[in-house]
Amino acid sequence: NKDYLFDSEERLEIVRNALFKDLKMNKKKIILISFKSLTTNLCKKYKSNIILRGLRAVSDFEYEFQLAGMNKKLSEEIETIFLMSDIENQIISSKFVKEIWKFNGKIDNFLTKSATKILKSKLK
C-alpha cells in the first residue's frame, strides 16, 4: 500500500483540472470515477471487460502483470491492455517530484500547471 499525499477526492480533482483545464479535453467523452472496491467489480458495474493500465518502465510490468492475472482469476471475461507512456514521461514518478521539490528544484516540467500549483500549496 502506498502512502498518498492527497486523498482520493483531491487526486480526482487534480486529474479533472489536468484534463479539462490544462489539456482542454472534451468533458463529454471522459468519465472520472473514484472507487473503493475491486477493479473487476467496477468493470461489471459499468459493463466493461477491458482494463487499461499504463506502464512507465519494465519495473512496473511485474506488478501490473500479477495484478492482471488476479483480475483475470476474479473475472475471466476481463482483459487487461498495457500502454507504454511516452518516452518523456517514463522517468516521472511522484516520489521523484516530491524529492526535487524538497530540495528546491523546479517541478514545473514534470506536472501540469494546475497540478504544480496544488502540489506547491500542499507541500508548503
Model-derived features: positions:
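Nucleotidyltransferase catalytic core that binds NTPs
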Residues: 1-124
